[in-house]
């Protein structure tokens, strides 16, 4: 299911005209095979900064520019949901100065981008334990979500203070409470019902998960939701991740056959029926 990026048919960075033509094709002629929901593990900010002898926070600052490019790419191609792993439950263990810097960057991002997101019909959403986020930052996030709540072109879903295991444990506790109170009957418990207790309730599972930075793991991200997600790993560090790199991931996704546990023959038969 996973693949390290290699020689794909996506255009070269050196040929922006070819890239633009491919981008237009991706949003029209091949829209049927476009992933609806893309999740990204944005890895490599620290290494990007270290290689340039810069403070780690400068890598995160440059990474924020890649976030903007990713949002623009989704808007250009028609991807409907973009989930970004911005801050994990484990990230609280990092030096306080780095955590504070990340929170400042998030605040700056909301200040600088919110109105443009709203004008482009982007809905801001979050998953994760926001109770651990500093109160002022949490209030700003809440206000930004309220401001964009009715937008429909793209859902920008930011994972903040999020961990896949914590998500599952929280859901188990919620379901156990419902069972104990009698609001849910044991016989009615299904995967679909369980999903309603996850942070991602109401959202489809990701079709494609991209990890930048070269590491080949998913780092406690969307563990339940990624059961049948296509995985794509690229050595490109997140601050360097371009629209061309994003397109390469999409082209790789389109080249795969999603079987969901079935055989290739079964999938081809189902596609023929459709």
Enumerate the predicted regions with their spans.
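Flexible, compositionally biased loop and terminal segments
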Residues: 2-274
């Amino acid at each position: 299911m996973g693949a390290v990026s290699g020689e794909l048919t996506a255009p070269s960075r050196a040929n922006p005209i070819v890239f633009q033509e491919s981008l237009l094709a991706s949003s029209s002629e091949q829209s049927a095979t476009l992933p609806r929901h893309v999740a990204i593990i944005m890895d490599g900010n620290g290494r990007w900064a270290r290689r340039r002898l810069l403070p780690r926070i400068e890598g995160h600052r440059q990474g924020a520019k890649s976030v903007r490019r990713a949002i623009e790419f989704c808007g250009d191609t028609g991807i409907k949901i973009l989930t970004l792993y911005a801050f994990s439950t484990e990230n609280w263990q990092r030096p306080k100065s780095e955590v504070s810097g990340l929170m400042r960057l998030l605040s700056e991002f909301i200040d600088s981008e919110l109105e443009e997101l709203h004008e482009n019909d982007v809905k801001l959403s979050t998953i994760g334990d926001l109770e651990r986020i500093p109160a002022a930052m949490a209030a700003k996030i809440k206000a930004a979500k309220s401001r964009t709540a009715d937008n429909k072109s793209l859902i920008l879903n930011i994972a903040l203070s999020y961990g896949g295991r914590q998500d599952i444990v929280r859901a188990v506790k919620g379901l156990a409470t419902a069972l104990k109170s009698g609001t849910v009957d044991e016989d009615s418990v299904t995967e679909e019902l369980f999903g309603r207790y996850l942070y991602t309730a109401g959202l489809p599972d990701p079709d494609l998960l991209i990890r930048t930075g070269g590491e080949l793991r998913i780092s406690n991200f969307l563990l339940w939701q990624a059961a049948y997600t296509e995985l794509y790993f690229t050595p490109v560090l997140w601050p360097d991740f371009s629209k061309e790199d994003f397109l390469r991931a999409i082209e790789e996704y389109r080249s795969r056959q999603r079987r969901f546990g079935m055989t290739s023959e079964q999938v081809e038969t189902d596609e023929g029926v459709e």
